[in-house]
């Protein structure tokens, strides 16, 4: 659990966006709604919805997680079916569910470790049963 309320992020983001940065990236997972401070989530979500240059991290989870039909994820998840995409493809994604999906601009922060378990490279995109999911850095290339 992240210790700061979303009001901290919202309070940081408002003046930062006033400076017109090309992009702001949160490499933090906003996957759980704050049940104690829902107004903080709402404020943060409103700022994200109004800004087209704020990007959030997401993660493909391992096989132990309960998989969901990829086609059922919101469009904001950024999954793109390729020519070999299976209609019944499933995967488990940790998405920023604390934020309305209409405000999502996200990318995967997964990496594939080397045989010794150390991550020395970064996945440009994830291939999930014929579906492509862009990494967070790749998502930023288009700005």
Please name every model-derived segment.
Residues 1-141:
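Non-transmembrane functional regions of envelope-associated proteins
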């Amino acid at each position: 659990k992240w210790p700061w309320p979303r009001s901290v992020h919202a309070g940081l983001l408002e003046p930062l966006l006033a400076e017109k940065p090309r992009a702001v990236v949160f490499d933090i997972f906003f996957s759980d709604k704050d049940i104690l401070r829902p107004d903080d989530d709402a404020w943060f979500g409103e700022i994200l919805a109004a800004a087209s240059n704020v990007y959030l991290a997401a993660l493909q989870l391992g096989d132990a997680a309960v998989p969901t039909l990829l086609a059922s994820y919101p469009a904001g998840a950024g999954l793109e079916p390729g020519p070999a995409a299976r209609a019944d493809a499933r995967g488990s994604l940790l998405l920023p569910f604390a934020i309305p999906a209409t405000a999502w601009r996200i990318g995967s922060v997964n990496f594939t470790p080397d045989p010794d378990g150390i991550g020395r490279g970064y996945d440009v995109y994830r291939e999930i049963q014929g579906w492509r999911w862009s990494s967070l850095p790749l998502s930023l290339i288009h700005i």
